[in-house]
Amino acid sequence: MKILIPTAKEMNTDHPCIEALPLREESQAVLDSLAHYSASELETFYKVSAEKAEEEYAHIQALKDHRAKHYPALKLFDGLMYRHIKRDGLTEAEQTYLENHVLITSALYGVVPALSPMAPHRLDFLMKLKVAGKTLKSHWKSAYDEALQDEDLIFSLLSSEFETVFSKEIREKMVTFKFMEDKGGQLKIHSTISKKARGAFLTALIEEQVQTVEQARKLRFAGFDYRPDLSSDLELVFVKQA
């Protein structure tokens, strides 16, 4: 069983560095494509300020020149979902579960264990980067599938942009999750609630050592309860009262 989570734009480098691993062939090809951009071109590519573009340019060049500092990916990313994941003070069993089951899907590094070394970078599958004439999704599809081909059960906490990198065959093994808020009988979904809930849900999976869909259905976390009436075999819905 594997649990998939996406990367995040926000990063926190206030952690001890760890040793880098050599970039895999697919990652090197992506980096080579990114390295063609000047800082001013990155401003347009990323749709960010000149200052942010300079920062990203420095990140790319540092990776290219093997100067980049690397951090455990789960600690490097610091978006809303990540801030709601239990990342410190884990028991030995929780640490083992995290290492064995949680994978991060990256447009630069591929599908990798959650504590793999990553350098600060900004890239997702909505960005129109061409790698050897292919889109990012096409470039990564076979490697993404390969990472999960032996898995019978996959819990996906990904957004659709990441899920659609995988083939239909792999996606059919995925159990997805929806987190909703009940406001006076009206069920609402919004980004902030979903991101926080994904982090809290992953924490519950880790703490309870969940291995099956049946175990996942029994979880209660951050005010969320499983709603069988709204769920299906491959989509579990959890609702909290507003």
Question: Where on the chain are the PLM-derived regions?
Answer:
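Short hydrophobic beta-strand segments
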Residues: 2-6, 153-156
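Active-site helix-to-loop segments that bind/position phosphate- or nucleotide-bearing substrates
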Residues: 4-89
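Internal, well-folded beta-alpha domain core
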Residues: 86-242
